[in-house]
Amino acid sequence: MSKRIKRLRLMAEYKSTGIFVESPRPLIGEISHDHLNISPELSEAIFRWIDEFDSWLNWDDPMNSPSVPEKEINRFNKQGEELMKQLQKELGPSIKVRYVPTK
C-alpha cells in the first residue's frame, strides 16, 4: 500500500468489519482486519461485537426490527469504546483511532 493509513474509526455497521479508514482520502472506506497489524483475538472480538449489532436487525423486514433498550445500547457502546482503546494500543501512535457510538 503506497499510502499510509493515518486515521481509522471503529463503528457498528451492518455486515461490516467494523473498521473504516478516514484518512488518507484514496483509502477511505471499510478495511479488512487482515490489512491491519492487529491480534487475532482483537479481530475476533470486533467481529463478535458486529455480530451482536447485526442480530438487532430483522433481516426479513428491517422496518419491523425490534427497538433495542437504551441500557443495551449503552452497554454495547461501552464495549465499543474498550475495543477502540485496544485497537489504538495495538496499532500504536502513528494511526489515530476514534469510536462512533451507536444511537
Language-model features, listed with the residues they occupy:
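Intrinsic low-complexity, intrinsically disordered or marginally ordered coil/linker segments
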Residues: 1-103
